[in-house]
Amino acid sequence: MTTRSVSSSSYRRMFGGPGTASRPSSSRSYVTTSTRTYSLGSALRPSTSRSLYASSPGGVYATRSSAVRLRSSVPGVRLLQDSVDFSLADAINTEFKNTRTNEKVELQELNDRFANYIDKVRFLEQQNKILLAELEQLKGQGKSRLGDLYEEEMRELRRQVDQLTNDKARVEVERDNLTEDIMRLREKLQEEMLQREEAENTLQSFRQDVDNASLARLDLERKVESLQEEIAFLKKLHEEEIQELQAQIQEQHVQIDVDVSKPDLTAALRDVRQQYESVAAKNLQEAEEWYKSKFADLSEAANRNNDALRQAKQESNEYRRQVQSLTCEVDALKGTNESLERQMREMEENFAVEAANYQDTIGRLQDEIQNMKEEMARHLREYQDLLNVKMALDIEIATYRKLLEGEESRISLPLPNFSSLNLRETNLDSLPLVDTHSKRTLLIKTVETRDGQVINETSQHHDDLE
């Protein structure tokens, strides 16, 4: 906190002597040189808690350690010797000139550094103005324009997502309706297939009946043929009997003609012939009636079987046409279902791709917004850092100004002429000691900031002696 400067006596350092050497260690020399140390601090770094040190009059950046100054008005200065060589004054003047030359060089360096700091401050102020303009532009125009643009694009994306959601719901409803239609058609197809199986079974039974009827018809035809053969045989037999009877009648007639005396035989033959003719006619009539009745029955049965067969064929053809039409309808519905399912899959894939693209766009826009926010925060931090650097540079400039003012005031003081001093002998033991301590006031200022805003500021004063 304090910087001490060790003062050495120029007189003892240059001349020495037994008088001075025999003095106790508590004695002090009164011809001294003053040294001054300048400490230049760098720019303060921004932090959550900063401590700014300032001292009076020069501040923490200029620590001054002062030794006893040689004043021309110091009373009671006496030396042990009556006469002193004035070359001592020349040596002191030479050393003082060297010190002044060194101080001038140091001041020149300080001025150069001060000019560099001023240029740096001006450059930082220009950068600060540029950043402030960019920040205002980002806050004013960029925020509203980008915000409106992002909001409009987000609204458009939400509208498209809602439209796609509605389209998806509509397609799902159509898919459900088509699924119900397909299920209904499948049930109808099952019913038609059952009816087809029943028709085929009925047709098979009808075919069996037709086969049975055909067999019966063949049997009846064989019976009719056998009956016709029997009738023909009976007719032939009847004709032969008639011929035999006629031959017998002729023979009897001849005999009757020959034997006129027998009239009763002719009447008997006539009676026998009539009886045979009546029996033959009766048998022929009965045979014809039985044949006609059997033929009518067989014809009627054949007609019935033909009607049933024709009806069965018609029903079979009708069922076949229905099965073909239903098969074509099922195939068409299958094709429609496949096309709708393919369209639904394509729409789902397109919707998934578009949704992924929209999600990517939303993510990219959110990343851009986050990057813009981070960039704005970075600009704000840089601006705050520049403000902190500017404050530190302002403090250093004020410190340098005070140092320069102190140096100018010190340079403007009149310098004593050592050649005109009247050195007289005096008792060093009786001389009062000159106070070699300098008082320094230390100001400790603590500033706490958060997000670029000052939240707490405290100041403490300390007095130190050197």
Curated annotation (Swiss-Prot):
Region: Coil 1B, residue numbers: 154-245
Coiled coil residues, start to end: 96-131, 154-245, 303-407
Name of protein: Vimentin
Residues modified to Phosphoserine: 5, 7-10, 25-26, 34, 39, 42, 47, 49, 51, 55-56, 66, 72-73, 83, 87, 144, 214, 226, 299, 325, 409, 412, 419-420, 430, 438, 459
Ranges of residues in domain IF rod: 103-411
Positions with biased composition (Low complexity): 1-13, 20-30
Start and end residues of each stretch annotated as Head: 1-95
N6-succinyllysine modifications at: 120, 129, 188, 294, 445
Region entry Coil 2, spans: 269-407
Residue(s) of cross-link: Glycyl lysine isopeptide (Lys-Gly) (interchain with G-Cter in SUMO2): 104, 120, 129, 139, 223, 262, 294, 313, 373, 439, 445
Species: Macaca fascicularis
Region (Coil 1A): 96-131
Region spans: Tail: 408-466
Subcellular location: Cytoplasm; Cytoplasm, Cytoskeleton; Nucleus matrix; Cell membrane
One cellular component (GO) term of this entry: axon
Pfam assignment, any one: Filament_head
